[in-house]
């Protein structure tokens, strides 16, 4: 940072979520606190943004700054004690507040209308299952939105790139695009198609394409109607009275009385190509997702294929 001398300094500098700072942000913080003090709040086990440039060791590097004192914040005041017991399998040192409610943990293997209530938060490791479920909820008269305008933007860009008029042609284009991408990766890495489909590049693109594929159904007449439907699904103006669906990454900092985890088997999402820091952050993400629930944590234990083929029943039986 060649402009260090131009950075204003302060007697006290406060920084939140310090585990997700990148190198430049951390240097800026230290420059601003030069001659003063800084208070950094964070959690090593909530470092989940390495994929977008955060320094995975940011918390430790701040803690190792000369004259820095590290204090624990191990008591969780949000989650019920039963939820914390489950979370301790991931982060053993976390403790429940002594006066916290017990909380409930439930598991379901079917989708039903009665399973979803206004104000619920539904979390998933990937975007495509969320989009598919949101479509089912809307079709059954349940107000629901997917959190994340960037997901809608990426879907619309792919649809425009496909340049198709009919839903059927778009669906075929998606299948061909996935095959084309897998082949390109396989040739580049000199591996088979199965291994190519386990790479981050393929998984990320396939997730975006599957977001579109999951709502390419007969009820929609053309691509223009599909685009309008996508805008509706991601309209956060109705968030107060809706079932809110979100990726685990976007749920960071949020909470709800009742949280449903969609396809929990995707936590952690690890392949043989995952680096050590990526593996750690996948477990961190699982910890973040499980601890969004204040009272009730519900697991919808269905595979992505089962979710795609499932219809919403009237009850949980």
PLM regions: where:
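Short, charged/polar "capping" segments at the starts of alpha-helices
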Residues: 305-310
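Short, electropositive alpha-helical surface patch
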Residues: 93, 311-317
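A short acidic-Thr-Gly-centered motif at the start of a beta-strand
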Residues: 5, 113-115, 234-238
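Conserved helicase motor core of SF1/SF2 NTP-dependent helicases
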Residues: 12-15, 19-107, 121-139, 145-156, ...
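Conserved helicase C-terminal RecA-like lobe
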Residues: 163-300
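Flexible, charged surface loops at secondary-structure boundaries
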Residues: 7-10, 113-118, 291-292
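Conserved helix/coil segment N-terminal to the catalytic DExD/H
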Residues: 1-7
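Conserved RecA-like ASCE P-loop NTPase motor core of nucleic-acid helicases/translocases
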Residues: 41, 73-75, 94-218, 229, ...
């Amino acid at each position: 940072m060649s402009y260090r001398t131009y950075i204003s300094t302060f007697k006290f500098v406060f920084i939140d979520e310090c585990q997700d700072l990148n190198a430049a942000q951390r240097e800026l913080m230290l420059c601003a606190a030069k001659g003063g003090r800084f208070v950094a709040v964070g959690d090593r086990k909530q470092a989940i943004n390495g994929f977008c440039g955060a320094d995975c060791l940011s918390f430790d590097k701040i803690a190792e700054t000369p004259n820095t004192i590290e204090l624990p914040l191990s008591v969780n005041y949000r989650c019920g004690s039963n939820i914390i017991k489950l979370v301790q399998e991931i982060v053993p040192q976390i403790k429940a507040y002594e006066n916290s409610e017990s909380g409930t943990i439930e598991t379901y293997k079917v989708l039903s209308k009665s399973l979803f209530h206004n104000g619920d938060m539904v979390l998933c490791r990937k975007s495509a299952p969320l989009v598919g479920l949101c479509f089912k909820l809307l079709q059954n008269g349940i107000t629901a939105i997917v959190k994340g305008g960037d997901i809608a933007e990426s879907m619309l860009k792919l649809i425009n790139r496909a340049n198709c008029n009919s839903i059927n042609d778009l669906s075929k284009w998606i299948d061909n695009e996935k095959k084309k991408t897998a082949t390109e990766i396989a040739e580049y890495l000199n591996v088979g198609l199965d291994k190519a489909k386990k790479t981050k590049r393929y998984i990320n693109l396939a997730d975006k394409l599957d977001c579109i594929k999951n709502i390419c159904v007969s009820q929609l007449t053309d691509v223009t109607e599909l685009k309008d439907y996508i805008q509706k699904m991601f309209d956060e103006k109705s968030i107060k009275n809706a079932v809110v669906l979100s990726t685990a990454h976007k749920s960071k900092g949020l909470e709800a009385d009742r949280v449903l985890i969609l396809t929990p088997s995707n936590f952690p999402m690890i392949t043989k190509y995952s680096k050590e820091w990526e593996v750690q952050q996948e477990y961190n993400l699982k910890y973040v997702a499980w601890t969004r629930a204040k009272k009730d944590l519900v697991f919808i234990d269905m595979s992505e294929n089962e979710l795609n083929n499932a219809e919403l029943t009237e009850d949980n039986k």
